[in-house]
């Protein structure tokens, strides 16, 4: 079934017009629907298989440790045991969603190039399953590095300029620097506990000095990929030079793996720590990215700074360790993935029509493409965090937390994020929408296609659903 799907999906430009026959189109849609159902079924089978591979933890240790690992669903029937991590399930969902949208942006490639993207995505998916299910430091670090390998291949094969090579070098250098700090933290944990098993490590009593050392190494190591201030400039460069498909996957999924790694490993340290300094770094990252939105003329770079701002906001939820805040952190993670996917996809829609991402060139979208302009307006409304959206609820908790730590810093933080950053973000998009057209887009330029409308609708449907989800949690 998968082979037949590839045959009908990978068409070269010189394909015959017979493919437009109604029967052929119907058959193709049936194949794609069947492939999607098989993919969902394979997801649950793979999760069950990976759980059996790592089930030794459930057989060798008491059942109460399963709940300590963050699993939200547990089934036991004799020797058969099944558990699943909540954040891990979110990562799998984001992997599939962002992968689907990212691959949909490369329709103009030949079959051989498309096949590379599918194979890399399959490698991503296997690495994600191992990453969320393993309970060993060595395996955890191994799968974390395997995720980076696929990222390099996507950037390398998805961009065809010399600057893309520089982006690959930037990406590899900075992520490997972060991995070095994570590796040092893992080695230090092993030297103290003489074990790489998560459940043994969690029962070990760390001193405050040891815990702070481990926490600092993990914060810097994973924080480079969040990214934290001032180690985030590699991300904007990579976004600008890489393909839109990779930008969607990087912002919607890959940065979440670093946050998951930080959350899971720091949960092994059962010591109360003063995290004021780390909170200050995250606040500085939010303020810096908010101010940088004012000076951007490249829409893709503007979205990259939005990613930095929101990822630092999400990290604040996990920094405090409060269960209620972490629950909203999970929701904020999904919301950011949908929002960043939507924003990067809208940038791709603009680029395909104007052949530019610069706000100096892209003007008058509303006068030429009404549906595209309407989608951008609703995107800005969801990003603004107006009353009734999930972002409003999440930002309320973050602002309340910063105000409790320091009133002066909290007030500055609220003003910069809610006013200065939002205005800087909105003005660039509204200039592109409502300014008088300065470039003829040509008579062949069309409004949003059915595929583009479907992807945009999918993102908005997810954002609307998440808007009502907090009321179900009360």
Curated annotation (Swiss-Prot):
Residues passing through the membrane, by range: 34-54, 86-106, 115-135, 137-157, 167-187, 211-231, 242-262, 276-295, 302-322, 325-345, 373-393, 405-425, 454-474
The species this protein was found in: Paramecium tetraurelia
Described function: Core subunit of the mitochondrial membrane respiratory chain NADH dehydrogenase (Complex I) that is believed to belong to the minimal assembly required for catalysis. Complex I functions in the transfer of electrons from NADH to the respiratory chain. The immediate electron acceptor for the enzyme is believed to be ubiquinone.
Catalytic activities: a ubiquinone + NADH + 5 H(+)(in) = a ubiquinol + NAD(+) + 4 H(+)(out)
Recorded family membership: Belongs to the complex I subunit 4 family.
EC number(s) on file: 7.1.1.2
Domain of life from the UniProt record: Eukaryota
GO biological processes: ATP synthesis coupled electron transport
UniProt protein name: NADH-ubiquinone oxidoreductase chain 4
Protein location: Mitochondrion membrane
GO cellular component: mitochondrial membrane
Keywords (A to Z) from UniProt: Electron transport, Membrane, Mitochondrion, NAD, Respiratory chain, Translocase, Transmembrane, Transmembrane helix, Transport, Ubiquinone
Membrane topology: Multi-pass membrane protein
Molecular function via GO: NADH dehydrogenase (ubiquinone) activity
